[in-house]
Amino acid sequence: MATMNTDATDKDISRFKVIFTLVVSGIECITGILGSGFITAIYGAEWARGKTLPTGDCIMLMLSFSRLLLQIWMMLENIFSLLFRIVYNQNTVYILFKVITVFLNHSNLWFAAWLKVFYCLRIANFNHPLFFLMKRKIIVLMPWLLGLSVLVSLSFSFPLSKDVFNVYVNSSIPIPSYNSTEKKYFSETNXVNLVFFYNIGIFIPLIMFILAATLLILSLKRHTLHMGSNATGSRDPSMKAHIGAIKATSYFLILYIFNAVALFLSMSNIFDTYSSWNILCKIIMAAYPXGHSIQLILGNPGLRRAWKRFQSQVPLYLKGQTL
């Protein structure tokens, strides 16, 4: 069995590293929580009023809510791993944090993948019968697909709770020069099981992303050839929709690949627990959901308008509170 082992003591992490990590990742998490919370509040309010949400908005609600949970959970894990190390390094607590983090990451990826597939089916134009069938059925099938995605994410994250992670604290490591003892934190990861369950959980949604992006590019090429040398081509709404969807998909893939690598490296214990590389992984992991939430708001005209209204109302509310 291939395993990765690390150990660390309280002396291995400086106060500067603790403060730096908490501040930087905290700013990223709070930014993401505000962005995801805003999207959740907008669509959640419409749903609470009894309105039937369009399929795209329903996916956005699921994605933003799961991402809100992910960012809150990551913030809690950073606080516990840096400030409450004895509690965090209890085997049950450590495994709980890791399993839920992977589950929320996988769920987020699935929801984002279905969002891209949905917009691909709306925007792209092909004459293939299978494409037409998917285009007609996607609205009916989407609630079932979202529920199935949660079950799949759970099925590939729950096995990580057994025979993958093992941590413990030794409180009796002697320090001869001080005639005292110090706490030492040991962690062990079964790299083979982690690689299998982690990668198989992200493989299918990543393939869906790549297929959606490929179909959009092919559809854009066909549309461009059809338009020919038409002078209004650059202002064509269909072309703008294609380009916008391709850009959004590309940005997400870049963000997610960095996040996936950082999350895997952090969980595999390749780096020492409190090394600068591990801290960098925490910062990258916090940046991904925040960055994508901002991209979703900026790329959606309705959310942009709602955000501008929100910005204009905040000063009025604060002014009223001071009177």
Curated annotation (Swiss-Prot):
SUPFAM superfamilies: Family A G protein-coupled receptor-like. GO terms for cellular component: plasma membrane. Residues 1-14, 80-100, 163-190, 269-276 are extracellular. The gene is TAS2R40. It comes from the Eukaryota. Several bitter taste receptors are expressed in a single taste receptor cell. Gustducin-coupled receptor implicated in the perception of bitter compounds in the oral cavity and the gastrointestinal tract. Signals through PLCB2 and the calcium-regulated cation channel TRPM5. It is a multi-pass membrane protein. Glycans are attached at N170, N179. Residues 36-58, 122-140, 212-247, 298-323 are cytoplasmic. This is Taste receptor type 2 member 40. Gene3D superfamilies: Rhodopsin 7-helix transmembrane proteins (1.20.1070.10). The lineage of its organism: Eukaryota, Metazoa, Chordata, Craniata, Vertebrata. Belongs to the G-protein coupled receptor T2R family. The chain crosses the membrane at residues 15-35, 59-79, 101-121, 141-162, 191-211, 248-268, 277-297. It is found in: Membrane. Keywords: G-protein coupled receptor, Glycoprotein, Membrane, Receptor, Sensory transduction, Taste, Transducer, Transmembrane, Transmembrane helix. One of its GO terms (molecular function) is G protein-coupled receptor activity. It comes from Papio hamadryas (Hamadryas baboon). InterPro entries: TAS2R.
